[in-house]
Amino acid sequence: MAKGQGRFRPLIRPSEPKPATLSFWNLVEAHVLRALRTEHGVSVKALRTALDYAERELRVERLLLSPELRSEAGQLFLERYGELIDLTASGQLAMKQVLEAHLRRVTWDDARFPIRLHPFVASGAGADEMVIAIDPAVSFGRPVVASRSVSTAVIVARIDAGERPVDIAADYGLSDADIEQAVLYERAA
C-alpha cells in the first residue's frame, strides 16, 4: 500500500451494512458532520477522537445525533450536567462558549431522537430561517416547505413549466419568500 493510504472506520455508520443503506438518522449525522468540517473547522482526526471517546467513556453511541454536541474553534464538546466536556482532549471540562446553529435546525422527539431536519438554504440574510424541512413522516422524507408541507420539487417543476412564482404561492397559501427558499434549496441540491 502506498504511503498515506489506508482504511479507516467510517465516521457515520450506515443503518444497514450490506448493502450499505443510509437512514434519516444518517442524513442528520451527515448534516452535522458537514457543518463540523466546513463551518467549524473540526479535523477528521478530532472527530474520530471525539466519536471514540464519547462511545467508549460516555456511552454515547451516535455522537453526531446528540443534541448536547457543541463545537468551538475546531474542537468538539458534549454538554453534560451543565458543563462542557472537551471530547477532543479526552474529556477535559471546557468553558461554555459554543456555536449551536446547526443543532438548532434539528427537531428532537421526547426520547431525544431526531425527527425533522431544517437544512440551511442560503447564507447571509435569511440563513436563520427554517422554511424547508425534511421529515420522514411527511411526504416520504422529501424536502417540503414546512408551513404547508408542499414539496419543493413540485414548486420548482411548476416554475420550470413556466408558471409564475406569485401564482404558485397563491395556490398553496405560501409567501413569495417561501417560494424563493424552495427554489434556492432545489437548485442547490
Segments predicted by a language model, with ranges:
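Long, charge-rich, low-complexity intrinsically disordered regions
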Residues: 6-7, 17-22, 29-161, 166-172, ...
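Major-groove DNA-recognition helix of helix-turn-helix-type DNA-binding domains
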Residues: 1-15
